[in-house]
Amino acid sequence: MAKKIVGFIKLQIPAGKANPSPPVGPALGQRGLNIMEFCKAFNAQTQGMEPGLPVPVVITAFADKSFTFVMKTPPATVLIKKAAKVDKGSSKPHTDKVGSITRAQAEEIAKTKMPDLTAADLDAAVRTIAGSARSMGITVEGV
C-alpha cells in the first residue's frame, strides 16, 4: 500500500547551503520531518551546481515522518540576470533597459530550463525565456 501523503513543502534554497535555520528548519519541523537528513541529502544532490544558485525544491511529507524531494531547475529570472550581468531587473521594464543577452545565451538558459517548461521545442522555450527577459527590462538580441 502507498504511504499516506500529509503535505507538500515548496522552498527555494541556495545550492549546497541547506541548513536547519529558517526557512528550512521551521518548514520541515512543522511536519515532524528529520531536518538534518534533508539538509545532508539536498546538499549532496546540489554539490555539482554553482554554490548559492537558488534551487526550487518540492518536499513530499508522508504520515510516517519520512519524505521525498524533487529538485527543479533554477528560476529563469536568476539565470537571465546572471547572463546579463545585472543585479536586478528594471523598475520600468518597457521603457528603461538595464542590459541585454544574445540569442545564444537565451538558448543556453532554455536548455537548462527545458525540463520545467511546457514548451514543445527549443525555439518555443527560447521565446519563453525572451519574454521573461523583456519583462525584466533586458533586451534579447536576435529574437
Swiss-Prot record:
UniProt keyword list: Methylation, Ribonucleoprotein, Ribosomal protein, RNA-binding, rRNA-binding
What exactly does this protein do? Answer: Forms part of the ribosomal stalk which helps the ribosome interact with GTP-bound translation factors.
Keyword rRNA-binding among UniProt keywords: yes
Q: Which NCBIfam families match?
A: L11_bact (TIGR01632)
Q: How is it modified after translation?
A: One or more lysine residues are methylated.
Q: Which family does it belong to?
A: Belongs to the universal ribosomal protein uL11 family.
> For this chain's UniProt record, which GO biological process terms are given?
translation
User: Per UniProt, what is one Pfam family of this protein?
Assistant: Ribosomal_L11
Q: Which Gene3D superfamilies match?
A: Ribosomal protein L11, C-terminal domain, Ribosomal protein L11/L12, N-terminal domain
Q: What is this protein called?
A: Large ribosomal subunit protein uL11
Does this UniProt record's set of keywords contain rRNA-binding?
yes
